[in-house]
Design a protein with these regions (language model features):
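All-alpha amphipathic helical-bundle segments outside canonical DNA-binding/catalytic cores
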Residues: 100, 137-142, 159-175, 226-227
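Short, basic, alpha-helical segments at the C-terminal edge of helix-turn-helix-like DNA-binding modules
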Residues: 78-83
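Short acidic/histidine-centered micro-motifs embedded in hydrophobic/aromatic stretches
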Residues: 122-126, 141, 175, 179
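Helix-turn-helix
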Residues: 25, 29, 33, 37-71, ...
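Hydrophobic alpha-helical connector segments
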Residues: 89-121, 169-176, 204-207
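C-terminal peripheral helix-coil segments that are non-catalytic and often amphipathic
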Residues: 1-14, 108-111, 115, 144-160, ...
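Short glycine/proline-centered loop/turn elements that form peptide/ligand docking sites
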Residues: 2-20, 32-36, 45-47, 55, ...
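Amphipathic alpha-helical segments used for helix-helix packing
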Residues: 101, 115-137, 187-193
Length: 227
């Protein structure tokens, strides 16, 4: 076919310029290899050149699809978190009937983490760690969109008498989020020690168990002498 190109070290099917429709796989490969390198080495220790080389393409493709390295990682997190954001927003905007809607949020959150097992490690390394490079952006773009909305929903449920009158909705939100995510953070220990495998039918059972645990802890009491 075409004579060898003397300008750029080539990937087998890569040519300079705008990617074609078949190059959607390139975008996914960049996300996949970028995620793996980030988890292995940390955000500050990985270059766009390294990510591109691992994906078998050029740094120009990172700039084309994502703008820069931060944009690539932002897209990676958005793809995982957006269904959860949508679920919380929908719950906030509708009257709902209390507990079943909260269970839907818990289900969305836990399924999101189960489907993206890299997510807890990324959050610990790049958000929770003192030197995490993505903490500010994660708070601004994701946490700030879900946590206040979740608190508002819990406050509404309390005011409508479905949750205990003395319940602090902020504390309840922290408890709900912790119940949903910590089992996956601790999986490297609970997996081999307890045989915990949150997948398939076991994941469904565990989600139901967690939702029941939360519900019974926050629900309004009907017996006299309780609030």
């Amino acid at each position: 076919m075409a004579a060898p190109n003397h300008q750029t070290p080539q990937s087998p099917t890569r040519r300079p310029g705008r990617p074609t429709g078949g190059d959607a796989a390139v975008r996914e490969s960049l996300l996949e290899h970028g995620r793996d390198l980030l988890l292995q080495h940390g955000f500050g220790n990985v270059s766009t050149r390294q990510i591109a080389a691992a994906a078998g393409t050029t740094p120009a493709m990172i700039h084309y699809y994502f703008g820069d390295k931060r944009g690539l990682y932002r897209t990676m997190i958005e793809s995982a978190v957006q269904p959860l954001i949508d679920s919380v927003r929908q719950l906030e905007q509708t009257a709902g009937d209390g507990t079943p809607d909260l269970e839907a949020v818990m289900r969305a959150y836990m399924r999101m983490v189960a489907a993206n097992p890299w997510f807890p490690a990324l959050i610990i390394r790049e958000v929770l760690d003192q030197n995490g490079r993505m903490r500010g952006e994660f708070i601004e773009r994701f946490a700030a969109k879900t946590a206040p909305a979740l608190v508002a929903v819990l406050r509404r449920e309390r005011e409508q008498g479905r949750l205990r009158a003395g319940l602090d909705p902020r504390f309840a939100a922290v408890s709900l989020l912790s119940l949903c995510v910590f089992p996956f953070v601790s999986l490297p220990i609970t997996g081999p020690v307890l045989g915990f495998r949150p997948e398939g039918a076991e994941l469904d059972r565990f989600i139901s168990h967690t939702a029941q645990l939360f519900r019974e802890g926050v629900a309004a009491r009907t017996e006299p002498g309780h609030d």
